[in-house]
Regions:
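N-terminal intrinsically disordered, low-complexity segments enriched in P/E/S/T
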Residues: 1-28, 44-103
Length: 103
């Protein structure tokens, strides 16, 4: 199973949590914080052995949210390290699936 997260259009922490929770089908009680992200990612990996999460648009995500983006991305890297889930990282957005915002 592969899940795609194109983070190129993420403007802030709130947008990130809304987008990720929908794309990864997190439960309704998701807490919209990094602890809740970790808990739900871990549950996702445990319930879907061999899952692959494709992170795209990392350059744009980091440029808009430099400090916070590092912490969020770290959750995914730790997931890969601890659970065996595979996390693919792309600075660009080859899928073009990211959020679009009016300038």
């Amino acid at each position: 199973m592969e899940k795609l997260l194109d983070l190129s259009g993420i403007l802030d922490e709130e947008t990130f949590h809304e987008y990720v929770s929908k794309r990864l089908d997190f439960p309704g009680y998701y807490g919209f914080n990094l602890d809740a992200l970790w808990d739900c990612l871990r549950d996702l990996a445990m319930n879907n052995p061999g899952i692959q999460i494709r992170l795209e648009g990392l350059a744009d995500f980091r440029s808009r949210n430099p400090d916070w983006a590092h912490k969020a991305i770290q959750c995914f890297l730790e997931l890969e390290e601890e659970s065996g889930a595979r996390v693919l990282k792309f600075d660009d957005s080859p899928s073009g699936e990211g959020l679009i915002h009016d300038a």
